[in-house]
Amino acid sequence: MSKSINNVTIEKKRAVSLDLARGTMLLLIVLAHAPLYLYAADPGIMHRVESGSFFDQIVNLFGIFIIDNRARAMFAVLLGYGLVLALEGQISKGKNENHAVKIVRRRSWYLILFGVVLAVLIGGQDILMAYGVAGLLVSPLLKCKMKTLIRTFTIITILYIIFIPIIWGFNMQAIGDYGFSPDVSAKDTYLSTTMLRLLFFPVIPVLIHFMFPILPSVILGLWIARYQLLIKPEQNLKKLYYITIIGLAISLIGALPLSFIGTLWYPSVFTAGMINGIHILTGIVGGLAYATGFGIIGSRLKNLGYFSLSLIALGKRSLTFFVLNEALLVILLSPVAFDLGGHVSNALAALIAISIWILSVILATIMEKNNLNGPLEILLRRLIYKNKTIERRPGY
């Protein structure tokens, strides 16, 4: 199972770097969401639960430095990149720019719909609604000049830099602790959680955009897509190395203060909230660095082995397997099904999350061998193009 990278990109018309990033992103997201179901554990730092063992501590530190507020930002960067590819795909088929932007907006509306289904009916941790809203908000920028794109990014990012630490400071002060109690409890049933989410799902994307800077990361995705950093990484290695090295350094340094809280440092809860705000803001750069890092990896792959091809297969079907992963977390960990979240440790929850991701890799590989698209990718494209005959293409 080894192919030339050129053959893969020509035959599949896909960016190897982009799909590798998407496939890995799913692992980071499922690891980020697993602790949210550990309702029997005491709150730790922010959304992390208190460590009960050395292995729990390792999982929490890995989460703070590598996953939390970085996986989400990486997802947003890749979303922005995908919006540009969707626009260019329409223009390459002879559509005018306004029609292409209309298609992108329609796609964003359907992502919101998928997010509603995930949050309300499946009960998973949804971010699709927030990214659908982001797609609608940034769609006018798809036609703008680079100067306008940079100006918009600068204004939005400065506003977030000013307000995010303050908002989180007051938020944690209101909570009165360093961490959040889980949103799930042993008394939850499918009916009760569904009815509650049915009432409050419109608030989810608004709250996410208010508390987390999604838009700057999406705009960064538009920016690196304009330079084709992930489509043509070989031609942009200097930029990729610069962004990745600087971005990872900022991301790791930005995570240091949060890692000290509760062990080496016991600040006021307001200060802890502000530190979390800094962690979130530096995650913007971290998410960008993760994406460009896969540009470097993609440029270095001369022949794709079994694991690389399997990861690419997963990346092509990232929408389908994002939803599947979230559904499996609900089934395995939440009280509405197997209720393991009330009985397993943080480390075991991480192992369950990794197992879910491995299952997704295996299923995606089987689908690739049988030339099968992801069912949600197929559905999304049919909805976008209103059941017209379309070119068969995996991914979204």
Question: Model regions: which residues?
Answer:
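Membrane-proximal soluble regions of multi-pass membrane proteins
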Residues: 58, 370-396
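Specific transmembrane alpha-helix
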Residues: 73-88, 128-142, 207-232, 282-302
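Alpha-helical transmembrane segments of multi-pass integral membrane proteins
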Residues: 266-370
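Long hydrophobic alpha-helical segments that form multi-pass transmembrane helix bundles
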Residues: 155-227
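Juxtamembrane membrane-water interface segments that cap and precede transmembrane helices
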Residues: 51-65, 188-203, 265-273
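Solvent-exposed interhelical
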Residues: 137-155, 223-246
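Functional transmembrane helices that form membrane-embedded active or gating regions
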Residues: 14-24, 240-248, 298-328, 372-384
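N-terminal signal-anchor module of multipass membrane proteins
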Residues: 2-79, 86
